[in-house]
Amino acid sequence: MFLRHCITFTMIALLAGCAGFGSREALQGHGDPQQWRAHKAQLSSLDGWQINGKVGIRAPRDSGSGTLFWLQRQDYYDIRLAGPLGRGAARLTGRPGGVVLEVANQGRYEATSPEALLEEQLGWQLPVSHLVWWVRGLPAPDSKSKLTLDGDSRLASLDQDGWQVQYLSYTEQNGYWLPERLKLHGKDLDVTLVVKDWQPRQLGH
């Protein structure tokens, strides 16, 4: 179960680098579209961050929770899980073209992309490159999305590629309003993420 849990979250949490925005959004809710566009443009400038928090996973046959560390530096990522979810530790590092998953006392797994690693290890297909956007409170730009804005013109929820993401609370860090608690619901999988510490950065291109 440990390997399944670790790969499940880390693959969802993976990313394929930061791309540009599309115009494939359907907006609804109480927010102002112009304020949303300004908010989205500000968050798109973030190409680096460090996150510390907790993650919970619920699947039909098993569930678990643990701590999360996520370091993002443009297209490089270092994602680590520890605690009851892992009964040890797991670390995922990579950039486009190469991904390495290391699981304590179980082994090392490599692939050319997070999607390929997930398919190889579990036989599952998930939009694994989307969370780099979702964790910032943004829709992924490469597919259609349905967005519900809250009264502050931030995301209250989004539907994209068969996944539903709920934004339960936000926190302000260095002038950025960033998700603090979010829930992801997909087919046979629920993920809850609670960010305890956000350190957003603009690294430049």
From Swiss-Prot:
Lipid-attached positions, N-palmitoyl cysteine: 18
GO CC terms, sorted: cell outer membrane
Signal peptide: 1-17
CDD domains reported for this sequence: LolB
Classification via Pfam families: LolB
Oligomeric form and interacting partners: Monomer.
Function comment: Plays a critical role in the incorporation of lipoproteins in the outer membrane after they are released by the LolA protein.
Principal location class: membrane
Keyword Transmembrane in record: no
Name listed for the protein in its UniProt record: Outer-membrane lipoprotein LolB
Membrane topology term: Lipid-anchor
Keywords in alphabetical order: Cell outer membrane, Chaperone, Lipoprotein, Membrane, Palmitate, Protein transport, Signal, Transport
Gene name of the record: lolB
Subcellular localization, as worded in the UniProt entry: Cell outer membrane
Lipid-substituted positions (S-diacylglycerol cysteine): 18
Family: Belongs to the LolB family.
Organism: Pseudomonas putida (strain ATCC 700007 / DSM 6899 / JCM 31910 / BCRC 17059 / LMG 24140 / F1)
Lineage top rank: taxon: Bacteria
SUPFAM superfamilies the record matches: Prokaryotic lipoproteins and lipoprotein localization factors
BP GO terms, sorted: lipoprotein localization to outer membrane; protein transport
